Amino acid sequence: QKGGYDTFMQKEMHEQPYVIKETLRAHIENDLAMPELSGLDASKINQIYFVACGTAYHASLYAQYILRTWVDLPIYCISASEFRYGNYRIDENTLCIFVSQSGETADTLAALKLSKENKAQTLSVTNVLGSSLARLSDFVLYTCAGPEIAVASTKAYTTQLVLLACLCLKLASLCNGVVESQNHMIDQLKQMPEVVEEMLQQEDKMAEFAKLLTDQKDAYFIGRQLDYLSVLEGALKLKEVSYVHADAYMAGELKHGPIALIEKDTVVIALATQPSVAQKTISNILETVARGAKVILITSKNQNTEGFDYVIRIPDVNPLFSCIPATVLLQELAYYVAKEKGCDVDKPRNLAKSVTVE
């Protein structure tokens, strides 16, 4: 049932504060005890792989990024469809982490089987109890997103982000990593349900911004560092539900080719939520404005936004977690572009909820 919402996708976007709270309750109470990992031999781990497809791959890129900030180990993130055929040196000293909403993604399952053949420790993050991924892995952590009916993932993705953040904190502890303040990080994560709720209250504003894209064939997303990972997911969502061609670029790469695509009235969606690189990103964005682009800017509360007409701000959160509220805004944008165009947002053409074929 849609519960009074127009679509399942909209309903599931609005369920995010609750399911994030449930996921956090399941995994960060009792000081990140995570008894599901009690048999993990951290002393053997000398490299970590995150392996996934699609939206789950974007969540895995996020996990790779934050774990690298805390742990001095080689940490990789590989698309499952590539992992199977690449020359990756997997052995008994490897931890392979597989992320899949359904737990039935064919390429991810094949990658898991390959890892087990090479004696790696395996851990899955999935939303479905008893799924193939869960049954075949040595260890499993569940997101608490509940059933997700819409093909385009929303609540499953944000619960993956928060669970992977919890997992990375736990792995940092197990692998002698350095976290500036674990208690602060946990407190910040506990604020995410309220932060996401605040973003959902910006729905009308994102619906207005969506009108900029209704007649566009192309859109360009840019960001740096974690913002780049967020725009990868934002571009995918826009493609999935509205059929607008969307590319995501590292902001610093604009001048190496993509800026040739920018002309009058081109729509650029830009993220600048990372304090260490925000000003450089703003400089890159202004280059697109100078060429006539219309820019939708998602940024932090204190960022100077002079020169931009379409601005939305996220609350003050730790920069490592800013992608969570930013992602919700990008979901809303994609949703309302699709609605304006009359697309079937719950069942986009040519897509399946669970990709069980290679």
Predicted region positions:
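Glycine-rich phosphate-binding loops that contact phosphosugars or nucleotide phosphates
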Residues: 44-191, 271-315, 333
